[in-house]
């Protein structure tokens, strides 16, 4: 059985405590310049985990990823300019 995962972005004041976030889920990426961590955890525990992480003093802001709720199948629409046949008169 596959667990549904959802990402979250944790903005930090300092990167010293970024290793501590490993206990909440999988740390996917740590940006040293912009001071944020991309973290993945189970979808059913995302709210509880976000509240717990936001309560720490070294955390500025926690934002969830909305990717699981977006439609990722796109329909191809033909371009209006390509739709017309310009070689009719020739």
UniProtKB/Swiss-Prot annotation:
Presence of the UniProt keyword Cytoplasm in the record: yes
Domain of life from the UniProt record: Bacteria
InterPro entries: DUF2129
GO cellular component, one term: cytoplasm
Cellular location(s): Cytoplasm
Location, primary (coarse class): cytoplasm
One Pfam family from the record: DUF2129
Keywords recorded for this protein, A-Z: Cytoplasm
HAMAP family reported in the protein's UniProt record: UPF0298
Family stated for the protein in its record: Belongs to the UPF0298 family.
Protein name (record): UPF0298 protein YlbG
Organism: Bacillus subtilis (strain 168)
């Amino acid at each position: 059985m596959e667990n549904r995962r959802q990402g979250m972005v944790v903005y930090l004041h300092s990167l010293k405590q970024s290793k501590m976030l490993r206990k909440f889920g999988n740390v996917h990426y740590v940006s040293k310049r912009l001071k944020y961590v991309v973290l993945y955890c189970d979808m059913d525990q995302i709210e509880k985990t976000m509240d717990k992480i936001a309560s720490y003093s070294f955390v500025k802001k926690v934002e969830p990823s909305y990717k699981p709720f977006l439609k990722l199948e796109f329909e191809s629409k033909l371009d209006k300019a390509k739709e017309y046949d310009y070689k009719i008169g020739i």
